[in-house]
Amino acid sequence: MKHDIAAKLLQIGAVALQPNEPFTWSSGLKSPIYCDNRLTLAYPGVRRLIADALAELIRTHFPKADLIAGTAAGIPHAAWVSERLELPMCYVRSQAKRHGKGKQIEGQARPGQRVVVIEDLISTGGTSLAAVRALKEAGCEVLGVAAIFTYGLEKAKQAFAAENLPAYTLTDYNTLIETAVRLGAVSEHDLATLRQWRENPEEWGS
């Protein structure tokens, strides 16, 4: 399944690899990869595959979940997953609104509910963990995070470990670059460059 999802992301252009002409992230980091999982929304077959896989992941790893929560980017996927699991859903804003009721959590998240957070992409883990903290402040028990893709950065691993929180993804960086070589999207020579970025993203390309 990891390779299937990776192949779909590459085929629809949700993930772009440019080892020789790197992207610049908003953080200023130079990267040979750019991921825009919002493109999955335009492909019904791909989004069904993702929703089915996320639902199965939750059944396997978080069978006691009774609430699905989406980050802003994870809202559509959270909706499709909650429908498959027949569970209620909410979503978590990056920060509380400054008008109306000033809510950060939209929908209903009651104290004691066991929640899985749905994210489209794990980079440093900051967005996911901000949602986790908001849900904990609301009295929920957060079981973990489920996402489509992760870069597998050490910073994210450390962040989730610090919160003692499991995070599972449908596919990952290593699987994706291996799949890209198999599909002819990048060369074996490019693979070495892509692996170097993964080992030291802060220094790569500097």
Swiss-Prot record:
It is an enzyme of class 2 (transferase). Orotate binds at residue 123. It comes from Bacillus caldolyticus. Catalyzes the transfer of a ribosyl phosphate group from 5-phosphoribose 1-diphosphate to orotate, leading to the formation of orotidine monophosphate (OMP). Gene3D superfamilies: 3.40.50.2020. One of its GO terms (molecular function) is orotate phosphoribosyltransferase activity. Induction: Repressed by uracil. Pathway: Pyrimidine metabolism; UMP biosynthesis via de novo pathway; UMP from orotate: step 1/2. It catalyses: orotidine 5'-phosphate + diphosphate = orotate + 5-phospho-alpha-D-ribose 1-diphosphate. This is Orotate phosphoribosyltransferase. The gene is pyrE. It comes from the Bacteria. 5-phospho-alpha-D-ribose 1-diphosphate binds at residues 93, 97, 99, 119-127. GO terms for biological process: 'de novo' UMP biosynthetic process; pyrimidine nucleobase biosynthetic process. The keyword Ribonucleoprotein does not apply. The keyword tRNA processing does not apply. Its EC number is 2.4.2.10. InterPro entries: OPRT (IPR023031), Or_phspho_trans_dom (IPR004467), PRibTrfase_dom (IPR000836), PRTase-like (IPR029057). CDD domains: PRTases_typeI (cd06223). Its cofactor is Mg(2+). Homodimer. It holds the Pfam family Pribosyltran. Keywords: Glycosyltransferase, Magnesium, Pyrimidine biosynthesis, Transferase.
